[in-house]
Amino acid sequence: MNPDPVYSVVVPFYNEADNLVALVREIDAMLRVLEQPAEIILVNDGSTDKFARPPGSPAFRIRWLDLSRNSGQSAAMYHGMQQARGRFVILMDADLQNDPMDAPKMLNKLESEQLDLVTGVRTKRNDNFVRRASSRVANAVRGALLQDHTSDTGCTLKVLRAEPAKRLPGWNGMHRFIPALVLSAGYKIGEMPVEHRARRSGVSKVAGGKRAVRATIDLLGMLWLSRRQFKGRLLAEED
């Protein structure tokens, strides 16, 4: 029986049958570097393809969570974090564009600088021009309005402590604003450069025009929430 995990790797996925085996293999290699009990939580966001379920290993347990329908990245991420048992949560995409080997460096920064969240910054993005340009504009507008001190909130690769992970609210679009939500709740955040690889298999699930409209509406909602959210955090209970 696997001991209680120190790390929970949460990966939402939708129709990534061609990537799951390689993904688990890469996460396995990363967890061996960390040398602590861990779990991988793969959250199936209503996939319609037929995917194989890679086995776990003595070093980690794989937990499969299935959503009743395709609910979006925020929902899959939220449910994965709520079910996480580790003291640290590692978030990443299933498309293999994130390099799991960046996670140990991010965790080292998290602990050495006493942060609660470290988010990746894709310095050399392997995306087309339209996606890179729209992302730069979105990051600039979001940063100016929310003052979240985050260069690349769209990078899924993040590491955070369990407490702020569990406090994240469940709403569509939440995944775009994790640094802002964590910061506005009174936690400390940081960022560091990470690899961004070309997609090997499958197709992107991001829709252009509709995504921009949703993101704008979500930004307005997030602006309201960041001003109304509780700012304090419970430090300790005294008798």
Task: Give the ranges of each region predicted by the language model.
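Structured catalytic core of nucleotide-sugar glycosyltransferases
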Residues: 1-129, 163, 167, 184-192, ...
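Hydrophobic helical membrane-anchoring modules
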Residues: 1-6, 147, 171-239
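Hydrophobic alpha-helical segments typical of transmembrane helices
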Residues: 76-77, 102, 133, 137, ...
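Short, hinge-like loop/turn segments at secondary-structure boundaries
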Residues: 81-82, 108, 134-138, 207-210
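Residues that recognize and position ribonucleotide moieties
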Residues: 82, 131, 158, 175-176
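Short, flexible, basic/aromatic active-site loop/helix in glycosyltransferases
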Residues: 111-153, 158-166, 217-221
